[in-house]
Amino acid sequence: METAGATADATAGPQKLSRKKYLALRKKERRKRRRQALARLREAELAQKEEEEDPLAEEKRLEEERLLEEERQRLHEEWLLREEKAQEEFRAKKKKEEEARKRKEELERKLKAEWEEQQRKEREEEEQKRQEKREREEAVQKMLDQAENELENGGTWQNPEPPMDIRVLEKDRANCPFYSKTGACRFGDRCSRKHNFPTSSPTLLIKGMFTTFGMEQCRRDDYDPDSSLEFSEEEIYQQFLDFYYDVLPEFKSVGKVIQFKVSCNLEPHLRGNVYVQYQSEEDCQAAFSVFNGRWYAGRQLQCEFCPVTRWKMAICGLFEVQQCPRGKHCNFLHVFRNPNNEYRDANRDLYPSPDWTSSSFGKNSERRERASHYDEYYGRSRRRRRSPSPDFYKRNGESDRKSSSRHRVKKSHRYGMKSRERRSSPSRRRKDHSPGPWEPEQEEPPQQESQSQPQPQPQSDP
């Protein structure tokens, strides 16, 4: 096209081309015609070749189309299967969701019905309780009106009897052994056993009357072991002595006191309890009327009659020999030692009582031996000026056990010597009917054994 344009320009133009340009243009035209001829020839050859190969190409094309159609059909069938499976899964899922929805609605309906039924029952119970309360109030008001009418008419008033079912329930329960022995139970009103509160007793109990800083701080030992450094056992015992000389004359002013004990237990239900036993119940009742509600050391005293009359069962025997395995958790009485061992015979139930006969005075020698043992044991305690406590026993238990074992060996050796002396001189004893020098010592080893190893007592709560 450019050549034609150039030729047209050349012929149309007013000026002629130079020979050189003219020859170049002609050469270009010849090359163009030659290329066109070659292209026409090539196209003719291709057409002829295609005509020769046309049956094979058609068959190949048809085969390819057939394979493509089969592949398309196979893919379509697979898609249909997948679609059908997906539809089935969808329908199953919808069915499960519908069933779950129905179950949820049914459950909600049941819960709502149960809640409404429960609310209805609660309303009925509340209404019944209110009705019963109104009936009781009406009965009480009727009883009060009747009592007022009787009082106005000159009648007498008395409290009504308790229900019979409560009495039957109390009879079926077993007695609490610790309340019967010590007058206190660590469970208190929650105890499953029966506490027989006496209406009259020769023993008066004042709970928590004796309090010191050391006894109050014992509750902090579990999480503050250094609290024991702020007080000493000597100070606690000195405070007990001051308390003893302060309160005992007041108790003696009411009647004859035959036992006075102050508990040094660390358990809350026994800590600082004061036990005062009078010779008669009348004196104890008089003391109750005098001291109950009275104030001492900034606290109001609450007195009660105590069932304890046998101190041998109440006092922990192992504590006296510094071998109590329960320590501060013992539920038997750990008591302070009274000055001059006062009322020491009452610790073993040896105080004289009205039912004693003249035959009981034949045991004077036994009591003298026991008293001498108490003097020997408590004399060492007075020199130490220390009140018995679990911590003190824990530090000095080993040395005291060694000394007590040596003491028992010495006593047994003396007993053997006296026995040999007794066997060597039978004629002299027959001649002289008075007891020989060995006879008081004959009872000494059993007394020593009974003092060093007291009667077995349960040391834990049932």
Swiss-Prot record:
The modification Phosphoserine is found at residues 353, 389. Residues 404-417 have a biased composition (Basic residues). It is found in: Nucleus. SUPFAM superfamilies: RNA-binding domain, RBD. Pfam families: RRM_1 (PF00076), zf-CCCH (PF00642). Residues 1-13 have a biased composition (Low complexity). A zinc finger (C3H1-type) spans 170-198, 310-337. Keywords: Isopeptide bond, Metal-binding, mRNA processing, mRNA splicing, Nucleus, Phosphoprotein, Repeat, Ribonucleoprotein, RNA-binding, Spliceosome, Ubl conjugation, Zinc, Zinc-finger. Residues 57-66, 364-379, 392-403 have a biased composition (Basic and acidic residues). Transmembrane segments: none annotated. Gene3D superfamilies: 3.30.70.330. Residues 202-308 form the RRM domain. The keyword Oxidoreductase does not apply. Residues 1-22, 44-66, 115-138, 354-462 are annotated as: Disordered. One of its GO terms (biological process) is mRNA splicing, via spliceosome. One of its GO terms (cellular component) is U12-type spliceosomal complex. There is a cross-link at residue 49 (Glycyl lysine isopeptide (Lys-Gly) (interchain with G-Cter in SUMO2)). Component of the U11/U12 snRNPs that are part of the U12-type spliceosome. Interacts (via RS domain) with SRSF1 and SRSF2. Interacts with U2AF2/U2AF65. PANTHER family: U2 SNRNP AUXILIARY FACTOR, SMALL SUBUNIT. Pre-mRNA-binding protein required for splicing of both U2- and U12-type introns. Selectively interacts with the 3'-splice site of U2- and U12-type pre-mRNAs and promotes different steps in U2 and U12 intron splicing. Recruited to U12 pre-mRNAs in an ATP-dependent manner and is required for assembly of the prespliceosome, a precursor to other spliceosomal complexes. For U2-type introns, it is selectively and specifically required for the second step of splicing. This is U2 small nuclear ribonucleoprotein auxiliary factor 35 kDa subunit-related protein 2. It comes from Mus musculus. The gene is Zrsr2.
